[in-house]
Amino acid sequence: MFRFLRHSAPCAAFALTCLITPAPEADAARMLIPMYAYPTAGSALWNGVRDASATVDITAIINPANGPGTSVDANYQRRIAELDARGVKLAGYVYTGYGTRPLADVLADMDTFRALYPQVTLLFVDEQSNDVATLEYYAAIHAHAAAAGYARVFGNPGTNTPEAFTTSASIPVTTVIYESPYSGWPAYAADSYVGARPAGDFAMMVTNVGTAARMRECVDLAKARNVDYIYVTHDKGANPYDALPTYWSEETARIAAP
């Protein structure tokens, strides 16, 4: 029932108007982790994120039902409160179908997250287009996010994106510039503007990373490429975000290290 991150967004350039650049953020790297497993009391994923919150700055993507669902799920409510109490930042998941999903439905999901789970103060926008025809669509999402009380939008085209798409007049934006298996990460080349911007403007998620040595390589490359929000996992398949990475403790320490 969950909708998972995709990589087929078109790459036509477009420009946002009235752009602002968020103020530079701290140098420490952070983790952006999709929590696409049901929050049972014994969930290794949820327990691991909770317990690692003292080690690394974590933003967890929350996805109860391909979005917020229509009513409070008591297990999500309890676990979200638990993570919030530990200082984990919480981003609500909405999908946009690369600009084809009705805008009213996206905005409604954003409002529902704030109503059902008020600790969710960040927004994760999946299946983000970078087609010029969708400019007003995403500008409306940014404006609505600010009005609804969100503090930041994480946009996920999952690939290199025209720079104009990575800022907003309404709200700070972080863009996922790489979200794919390990095979493409070593040779990946970020757009030139990435190195000149605050690292907090960018995120990456690398899946199918089978060893701790490759995890360390991925994290170090992300930092070298000026990417602040980092996630690496051994997981793969239709949902590569439903298990705690096998090298979890080492990964959290690696991301948090200067």
Task: Give, region by region, the residue ranges found by the protein language model.
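Short, flexible coil/linker segments at or flanking structured domains
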Residues: 7-8, 21, 111, 192
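Bacterial N-terminal signal peptides
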Residues: 11-21
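Glycan-processing catalytic domains of CAZymes
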Residues: 26-258
